[in-house]
Amino acid sequence: MMTGRELTDLLSKSYRRSHLTGTVENGVIAALDMEGRLFTVVNNKVINRVVPSAIINRSNKNAYQNPGGDTLWPAPEGTSLGYEYTTGTWRVPPSITGAVWEVVEEAPDRSVIRAETDLVNNLQTGIPCEFERIIEIKAIDNGLIQKVTEIIRYVGTRKLQKGTFLLAPWSLCQFDSGTLGKVTMPPPGKEDIWDYYEPSESQRQLQNNLYVVQTK
């Protein structure tokens, strides 16, 4: 695993702006020039997936660079109201890869970052937005509690009619995980869980009042 300092050094050498909430040993590094991605550091180890080559290189029409971390995406991706197929094939819109994220509020344990991002859906409807991430942390024994509030705010002046657009924030958080990897969380309601690909019932169960999901 990469250390927090190694990641901030890599971002700096790659001419990427970053912002730290907390400390470089226990905190959250926001990569402001990489779609506002977040990288969480616990006990001086970056727990998110990090792809150095995608930090050094830039996304363009021919190749999308996925640096890892935790990023805010607009939903839906597909359908006539989605945002990732406006040219016929999947792509991350340049308005997202080129968004200029800024720190608009900061404190030792809380930061707010924001970017203007104009979205275009498959109906070719333009939707001017602000993307915002509110990052809050609390240090605990041998760990870190992190809370991120995701916001996509419509800032246009025209009233959008029902059926002409859909818009919701979702976060894609990436980790490198082996065969023993698992995620634990408070039990969600049955209506809040569904499978995007293959059935996953065999990989998730309740243990000691916690929902445990095997990652492989």
Residue map of PLM features:
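Surface-exposed acidic/polar loop and edge beta-strand patches at domain peripheries
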Residues: M1-K147, I151, V155-K216
